[in-house]
Curated annotation (Swiss-Prot):
Protein known as: Protein Wnt-5b
UniProt keyword annotation of Secreted present: yes
Annotated glycan sites: N69, N83
Disulfide bond positions: C82-C97
Subcellular location: Secreted, Extracellular space, Extracellular matrix
GO biological process, any: positive regulation of convergent extension involved in gastrulation
Any one Pfam family match given in the protein's UniProt record, by short name: wnt
Signal peptide: none
Alphabetical keyword list: Developmental protein, Disulfide bond, Extracellular matrix, Glycoprotein, Lipoprotein, Secreted, Wnt signaling pathway
InterPro entries hit by this protein: Wnt (IPR005817), Wnt_C (IPR043158)
Taxonomic source organism: Plethodon jordani
Length: 116
């Protein structure tokens, strides 16, 4: 005749797109660091704020993904197809790294499997 209550708590991941956008934002604002003579990390540019525990930091520059680099496994972007009208990652301006690009049109003929 006694009563009891039950509470359940759980954690749930945010939407995958939101997680990706958040990580990209952190990546884009990561702080460049170097190791000083005492073996401690310090900012490369002291004009920026000291990073918090929530910020990303790096000591090495990212490779140039526009160029082929066998040591990193990057194939570069030379010869890849791009979308002239896109402003995203697949857009020609970004993907071609300012080198310019060739334009061409293709006609694609496919069977439509239509039924009448």
């Amino acid at each position: 005749s006694g009563s009891c209550s039950l509470k359940t708590c759980w954690l749930q991941l945010a939407d995958f797109r939101k997680v990706g956008d958040h990580l990209k934002e952190k990546y884009d604002s990561a702080a460049a660091m170097r190791i000083n003579r005492k073996g401690k990390l310090e900012l490369v540019n002291s004009r920026f704020n000291t990073p918090t525990v929530e910020d990303l930091v790096y000591t090495d520059q990212s490779p140039d993904y526009c160029l082929r680099n066998e040591s990193t496994g990057s194939m570069g972007t030379l010869g890849r197809l791009c979308n002239k009208t896109s402003e995203g990652m697949d857009g020609c301006e970004l993907m071609c790294c300012g080198r310019g690009y060739d334009q061409f049109k293709t006609v694609q003929v496919e069977r439509c499997h239509c039924k009448f």
